């Protein structure tokens, strides 16, 4: 582990011990995480004794599910589940890849559009016996409502988020929400409690609470972790980008000389 990764590990240990986090999240979807990034992240998560949740690229992303299995993910989230058919496809793909082991996993869907809300009860019915958690994605949900990101903490988004959460709870599912979670989202988080079981930043999944001090401290620490994660990722790819530059320059010079020798 390098120095940045050690700092990341220290923050995760503090987040777990003080701020009651559950898991670290990665994405094959919007974030587009690559396997080498996930391997590096997974080592830190393992040392912190936390779970890894991964959002796959779609309801039937079998290759992503294979990668999740290899990485030992504890929870898998499917994005943009907008119909009972999409839910059915997710169930089928999960059972195909995990076979009998699917029962040992936490299966999560993203409820993140007005279309999903419209079809929610049918989706939740289709997920019976398989689905564990409904995670509400506020960024896409607000966009699908025709609202700007500035309105993500407003009453319209809160009302729809609460309705989705209530219906999910009626079916016995756990409820999580995220998207645009920063200090200014604290009043929204407090209003949702205790209807939700969890909330999440881009990378960190927390147990639900309405304690303002815990929320502020936890969100700031999550932001520190995410900043270091991005720094480590950038430095890793910067090293890869420059490691062959000296040889590339030498080969270009040799080629130029060799080419000039061919000129008659």
Identify the meaning behind each predicted range.
Residues 1-264:
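Expand to "…catalyze enediolate/carbanion chemistry for C-C bond making/breaking, isomerization
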